[in-house]
Amino acid sequence: NPQVIAYYAGDEKSIDEFELEGVDQLIYSFLHLKGNQLAIDNEADSLTLLNVVNQKKKYPKLKVLVSLGGWGGCKTCSDVFSTEEDRIAFAISTAQIIASYQADGIDLDWEYPGISGFPGHKYQPEDRENFTDLVVQLRKYMKEGDILSFAAGANSDGYFEQSIEWDKVMPLVDNVNLMTYDFYGSGSSKTGHHTPLGSGEFKEGSAVSSIQALMNLGVKPE
């Protein structure tokens, strides 16, 4: 069945203003790395996450995840996730945060493994295999039933081919959340829709073409 999945990057109080009936997953964004550990940046973020999780009392079907990274938020990911020891340490810390906050899982938003993302952030070809093992370790240390997903850069050249080992990763995750936006922006030479459903006159990239690209790689819609 289709799911409604939303990201939340607001403050502690604003979440109370939203009607969350019908939302399946709410992903709190963003947590970051502190050394090789998943970390909450400050007390304000901790209070916000607590209140987001508290929404489950009002909406019993709601699942709350935390998200690692975001645009510019994964500066050390390539280095940290380059060793098995650090990947295991991250997985253990993630399981601890999920349990202590009574959350339901994690969404990985590393932009991007193996290809250029945020300017100046390190990337290397080995990121692709390291991402796979990161997912393996998370599955190993998270408890059964915890949700594991990742955000995929549909608008990034080479992402589908160079960032993810789809055949190995997809059996281990619950969802892949396609970032089907930023197809046009301030650096574009022509105007176009920021988040196109279908391909346009000047660019093939769109929600439809991104989903088709995943299916061509063997990723099943369900």
Task: Mark where each language-model region is.
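Conserved, mostly hydrophobic/aromatic
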Residues: 26, 66, 108, 138, ...
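Gly/Ser/Thr-rich helix-start
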Residues: 70-71, 106, 193
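Short, well-ordered coil/turn segments that N-cap beta-strands
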Residues: 2, 60-64, 102-106, 144-146, ...
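Glycan-recognition patch characteristic of GH18 chitinases/ENGases
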Residues: 1-98
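Generic structural signal for hydrophobic
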Residues: 18, 97-101, 169, 214
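Serine-hydrolase-like catalytic core of hydrolytic proteins
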Residues: 90, 94-116, 121-122, 126-130
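Substrate-binding surface in catalytic domains of secreted glycosidases
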Residues: 35-47, 113-222
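A cross-domain feature marking catalytic cores of carbohydrate-active enzymes
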Residues: 8, 30, 66-70, 110-112, ...
